[in-house]
Amino acid sequence: MEKLSGSLENVVFHNEENGYTVADLDVDGEMVTVVGHMVTVELGTHLTLLGKWTNHLVYGRQFQFEHYRVDLPTTEDGLIQYLSSGLLPGIGPKTAELIVERFGQDTLKILDDDPTRLLEIPGIGKKTLSRMLGAYQDQRDIRKVLIELQEYGVSSKMAMKLYNAYHDQTVAILLEDPYRIVRDIRGVGFKAADQLAEKLGVDRDNSKRIQAGVVQALRECYAQGNTYMNEEELIARAQELLGVDRETVEMGIRDTIISGAAHMDEIDGRRIYYPMGLYEAEDATALMMTQLAGSHFEADDIDVEEAIDRYESHIAITLDEEQRNAIKTAVKQGLVIITGGPGTGKTTIINGILNILQSMRLSVQLAAPTGRAAKRMTETTGEEAKTLHRLLEYHYDDNALTPTFERNADNPLELNALIVDEASMIDIVLMKSLLEAIEEGTRLILVGDADQLPSVGPGNVLSDLIESGIAPVVRLKRIYRQSEKSQISVNAKAINEGSVPRIDNQSDFVLIPEKNQEGIEKTVLDLLGYRLKDNAGIDVVHDVQVISPVKKGLVGTIALNQKIQNILNPASPRKNEHTFGPVVFREGDKVMQIRNNYQMKWRDALTFEEGDGVYNGDIGTVKSISDDKRQLTVAFTDGREAVYGFDQLDELAHAFAMTVHKSQGSEFPVVIMPLIGGSPLFLNRKLLYTGVTRAKQMMILVGRPEHFIRMIQSDDSRKRKTGLVFRIARYRNLSL
């Protein structure tokens, strides 16, 4: 690495939370832009940086540093500049001159060893001295920690995270157990902790290392959608991570269970292992669902029938027996599940339940897992629907590694009924939090399509609840939302049943044959560029969504987004833009949040409500980009606006094209979906069905017909490893 030394003259940008800094350094009279992570930034400070020179596409030549050191001044002029830099509150240039004039080269020694002598300086009283010494002590602690960490080869970015977590105890804590950073610091994984431990001289067979490796292996459940791992799977993965023998891993598993970080259970004679958080979520969900399902409400059949008749008159539609039964069940049961595909009348039933419960003078709340789904629910019911996070009043807790909600068992929701749409998207952790906030005597109505892809997070909650038999399940099979020429709902139903639908390309369901990915790409871009523009009533910018089965490749979302951006939102002198790595963000771009950020502040543009949290899958538009402030503002579809520092843009991706998984919970007037070959584990019926059911007015598939047929015939989607059905059965047996 190269070395650069100079005086900090200007701070262009500094993020207080993660330390990301862009600044100007005076190096022998030449101003140099430096980029990296610093704990504090005080003008006039002399720094030595270790890093490399880079060329930014927009900002030119920069020095990107990984390590830095604060060089204490050695000259009297340097001491005056250092003391008056803003580092010490109450000390300006004149007072700094008096201090240095009095103590000279011994100034810093006086500050360290005999600070009360500063009272000899006119203008410095006891209060000023106390404030000044507190700040100086903080800076001294920071310098000491940074120097020690850099001796172990820790980068400035990691040092910033560590210091923010442990302050002056950082080094002592790391020497005792470097692996605790995986538990304590959000976003730090086993690999980073293991690298740090190696630099600190921790043995490979150290018990804390082995336990951390076991926990890391179990944590992979979160990414894979499972809630537990089989014994052999856990042992093999832990061995791969740790590079130790089986016996050592088995001992580590026992120690991890004893420590309370993992839980062992048996299902059908097989040992299974949970991360403790997922075990607690699954077990609590099973118990609370069992209790909720045991609730029944007195309601006169004649009164309910009459209420349904009044609702029919109000909407001028005659409900069939299936729909009437769904409404009656929801009114009388503590827990009911309503499942069905597109066009099967779920919205009509939600409105019916809402209408009748409100006519009984009951308080009813509507909710959905995502902002897009909640907005759609609001539009179709005329009543406010909230995201589950907003309903549960999420708040950011810097010390919590999982979401923290104000609404819980101690502060429950004050409702008589809660109707949740798109319930297939709810993972086991969020379901547990939701159930904890529901008071005894509240009806819970879960509505969704169990045949879609399961939640992004761990669990397969809706399908597991249906399989468990814990509550009445109303299965909607008849298609109602269907015009004479529409084939979307009919074909989706056929796909879900494993039948190949008839496609005549004369309706709203089209398959355009293309033999290879080059042809698919060209057709998709042509559709957006000019072919769909001739179709009356279609706005290609707002109405059309490209949904791809994959991220990578010629027709994956990454490549398509770049090319679609140039068609739908080309560069213009009137639009600001910012380059982040290989990605150009431009005002007017359609973007998506790609990971949960529980700390991100937002403000509603209409109500001025403020809150914390932007979530994986939230979609919006780049409203503005400011190079001066080094920030980008996103206006989300539900009215919230959030400001991203340029260093946070790795949390955003373009959403002109999105994966099928990311499209869940949304509907679009027109959907274009490339069809490609691949493993049936991923390219299967469930994925195709989920993609097709996103379209409301037109579904366009592009690719080889045989790939379409193969996906329909492939029901080889990997079943998630979950224990909810087993645990519900256990609690039901206990209650008998």
Locate each region found by the language model.
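C-terminal accessory regions
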Residues: 616-736
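Conserved helicase motor core of P-loop NTPases
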Residues: 450-612
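ASCE P-loop NTPase helicase motor core
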Residues: 324-327, 332-506
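Conserved pre-motif I regulatory segment
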Residues: 306-334
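A generic structural signal for residues embedded in beta-strands
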Residues: 11, 49, 593, 622-625, ...
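Short, charged beta-turn/beta-strand-edge "cap" motif at the junction between a beta-strand
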Residues: 52-57, 594-600, 676-679
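Accessory, non-ATPase domains that flank or precede helicase/AAA+ motor cores in DNA-metabolism machines
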Residues: 1-303
